[in-house]
Amino acid sequence: MSHLYLQPMPRSYVKKEATKFFLGTNTEIILSSQCNSQDLESALLLQQQLHELIGFRLSVTKCFERNYSTPSIRFIKVDELEEEAYDLIIEETYIEIKATTSKGLFYGTQTLLQIIKNEGVELSGVEIKDCPYFRNRGFYHDVTRGKVPILETLKSLVDKLAHYKINQLQLYIEHSFAFTGFSEIWYDKDPLTAEEILLLDDYCQKRHVELVPSFALFGHLYEVLRSESYKHLCELDDESEFSFYDRMAHHTLDVSNEASLELVEKMMADVLPLFSSKKFNIGCDETFDLGKGKSHHLLNTLNDGELYVEFLNKIIQIAKNHDKDVLFWGDVVLRYEHL
């Protein structure tokens, strides 16, 4: 092939059309002596993917560099590259993936797999030098609308993200998670469980994808604020039938009720320990009803922007108490630049 067809395209590459490497049953996958258990995960992933692609399983081993056999695919740790960078070299008798970190080796593995999917068992020679342009490469996944995905479906999504070097998955949950003590909200929703989140988080770590929790803690808490236990915390009383518009446009917490903050804290305490990421997206968008109902009297001393920020800061502080770095949507605060 005269061009590389890769996503994303590497920063630089040099093709060597006259050079060919043949993937055969005698090809070994070799880890250098500096490689660790994370690098073994990359090697085993390559082994598994190649078995599915070409029909035979290559052996995996580890040795000192001077003992490399040929033909082989070599995972080599070096000192001089950036954190997520890698070099991929395809020569006639060997393939080398070089990186300073396990992330780099993993990304080099993904690039090699793309090349093999394009070319088959006879690979053209190439020298690739690559490093992602952006430190945060995220995908936001809302699992609250329609069918809740099962764990295997989410794992499949993680595999696809990792293949394209996406390193962050923000998982948006509301009633699609089985919060402890909230069964009236999720009992008929087939929600994700705490155990499934733990397993997904572990799966993400092995593929260098950061799993970031995200859920509503201020506005559009539709299922929570329509429940018998918590409907008294809704800014506007609502007994209407379900509609997609009302699901998003209403059901904001009553910030004048101290129990609203207690609810927020309870939800956080139930979910945050399940995620290894330090990041937490607290939502806090689309608080359309704020100050229009039960909390209206607070506007005697605060404007609606100040009312929003005051409760937002309380939520942020709870998250910080759990040692989390907070993200939130900016649709509301951007209307009040002075805040």
Describe every region a protein language model picked out.
Residues 1-137:
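Contiguous, structured surface segment used for ligand recognition
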Residues 15-17, 126, 267-268, 335-338:
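A generic local structural motif
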Residues 134-328:
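Substrate-binding cleft of carbohydrate-active enzyme catalytic domains
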